[in-house]
Amino acid sequence: MPQLEFAWWIVNFSLIWASVLIVISLLLNSFPPNSAGQSSSSLTLNKTTTNWQWL
């Protein structure tokens, strides 16, 4: 029955692409865009220096 195989191919194709698009949209929405006027507090780096003492 080629019609049934083609129907399952269409179903699997649509399910795979729907899941791929959902995963991509979730990944893109999980990272909020940083606007130019807003500084992200999670990406701040505390720069410190160390004074080495030579023996």
Curated annotation (Swiss-Prot):
InterPro entries, A to Z: ATP8_metazoa (IPR001421)
Q: Which GO terms describe its biological process?
A: proton motive force-driven ATP synthesis
Q: Which Pfam families match?
A: ATP-synt_8
Subcellular localization = Mitochondrion membrane
State where it is primarily located: mitochondrion
> Domain of life of the organism in this record?
Eukaryota
Report TM segments: 8-28
- The segments labelled Disordered in the record are 34-55
Keyword Disulfide bond assigned to the entry: answer is no
Mention any one GO cellular component term assigned to this protein in its UniProt record: mitochondrial membrane
Please tell me whether the keyword Cell wall biogenesis/degradation is annotated for this protein: no
Main function: Mitochondrial membrane ATP synthase (F(1)F(0) ATP synthase or Complex V) produces ATP from ADP in the presence of a proton gradient across the membrane which is generated by electron transport complexes of the respiratory chain. F-type ATPases consist of two structural domains, F(1) - containing the extramembraneous catalytic core and F(0) - containing the membrane proton channel, linked together by a central stalk and a peripheral stalk. During catalysis, ATP synthesis in the catalytic domain of F(1) is coupled via a rotary mechanism of the central stalk subunits to proton translocation.
Instruction: Write out the similarity annotation.
Output: Belongs to the ATPase protein 8 family.
Identification of the protein by name: ATP synthase protein 8
Q: From which organism does this entry originate?
A: Strongylocentrotus purpuratus (Purple sea urchin)
Instruction: Name the lineage.
Output: Eukaryota, Metazoa, Echinodermata, Eleutherozoa, Echinozoa
